[in-house]
């Protein structure tokens, strides 16, 4: 492949960057870019001497299309790997269009001022990317991502037809903390506190947050409580798996997590509505 520009330097980005460096024959060179360049420099220092991949760093505001275009033109990557926040998907896609650079992300776009995520905003770019002769690969994490690959493989190689898909996302880890999120806390809490939905009979069925609970005995992990959530791969699978009748997505949560989340909700800390605090406007969830 040659060179990749990786935007973001949080937990998910760190894992992806480590994996890129383990495959230096593919990722010969990477540039790590983030609003806080010191995080990029720290990760670069940690990785140097452990990989043949050449690593550079850069500062960029991923909300600013002009800054992104300038960075892409300077780095000249073969592909941009977007591991920033979902709010920034569209600005990064715009920059890739302007520079005719291939694009990959792991989570679909959602507006910062609305706790709602769906593919419609990004799917609207399909013709633009086709006309530019470049590829945009959306939702290339585990879920979404691997879940879609598993479903497509099963349809092609194992089944004549698939009518029902249930995706069960289980975190069996326990590090002893009473409350911790699986990924970016702000995005995770927005996702969990939003209304759920699933696809059935050709239309969407909406549920209240955490309304539908099931118990499942996960091999190697044990019995866990899981709750129905909306998730983006439901949209893409409903579109691309012919004959599908129902698709649902469940995620496991421990009681301690849910208790702390409820406390945060009760005191207004999960709200995305701006409020005034000590003369400044803040968003409680980000605070």
Model-derived features: where do they sit?
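Conserved N-terminal Rossmann-fold NAD(P)-binding element of oxidoreductases
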Residues: 4-11
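N-terminal Rossmann-fold NAD(P) dinucleotide-binding loop
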Residues: 13-17
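Short beta-strand element of Class I
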Residues: 29-31
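Helix N-cap at the beta1-alpha1 junction of Rossmann-like dinucleotide-binding domains, i.e.
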Residues: 36-39
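Rossmann-fold cofactor-recognition segment
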Residues: 49-64
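Conserved Rossmann-fold cofactor-binding substructure of NAD(P)-dependent oxidoreductases
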Residues: 61-77, 84, 88
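Rossmann-fold NAD(P)-binding glycine/threonine-rich loop
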Residues: 107-134
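C-terminal catalytic/substrate-binding lobe primarily of soluble NAD(P)-dependent oxidoreductases
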Residues: 156-287
């Amino acid at each position: 492949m040659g060179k990749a520009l990786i935007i973001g330097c949080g937990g998910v980005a760190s894992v992806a960057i480590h994996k890129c460096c383990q495959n230096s024959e593919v990722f010969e060179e990477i540039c790590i870019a983030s609003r806080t360049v010191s995080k990029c420099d720290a990760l670069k220092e940690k990785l140097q001497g452990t990989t043949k991949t050449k690593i550079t760093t850069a500062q960029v505001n991923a909300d600013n299309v002009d800054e992104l275009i300038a960075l892409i033109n300077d780095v000249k990557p073969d592909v941009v790997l977007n591991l920033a926040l979902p709010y920034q998907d569209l600005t990064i896609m715009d920059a890739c269009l302007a520079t005719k650079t291939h694009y990959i992300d792991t989570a679909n776009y959602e507006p910062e001022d609305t706790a709602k995520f769906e593919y419609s905003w990004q799917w609207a770019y399909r013709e633009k990317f086709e006309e530019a002769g470049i590829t945009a690969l959306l939702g290339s994490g585990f879920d979404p991502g691997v879940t879609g690959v598993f479903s497509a493989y099963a349809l092609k190689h194992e089944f004549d037809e698939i009518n029902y898909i249930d995706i069960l996302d289980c975190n069996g880890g326990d590090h002893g903390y009473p409350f911790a999120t699986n990924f970016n806390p702000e995005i995770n809490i927005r996702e969990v506190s939003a209304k759920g939905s699933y696809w059935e009979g050709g239309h969407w069925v909406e549920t209240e947050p955490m309304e539908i609970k099931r118990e499942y005995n996960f091999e190697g992990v044990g019995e866990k409580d899981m709750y129905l959530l909306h998730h983006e791969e439901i949209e893409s699978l409903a579109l691309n798996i012919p004959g599908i009748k129902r698709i649902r997505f469940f995620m496991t949560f421990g009681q301690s997590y849910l208790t702390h989340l409820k406390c945060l909700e009760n005191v207004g800390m999960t709200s995305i509505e701006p409020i005034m605090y000590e003369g400044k406007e803040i968003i409680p969830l980000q605070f």
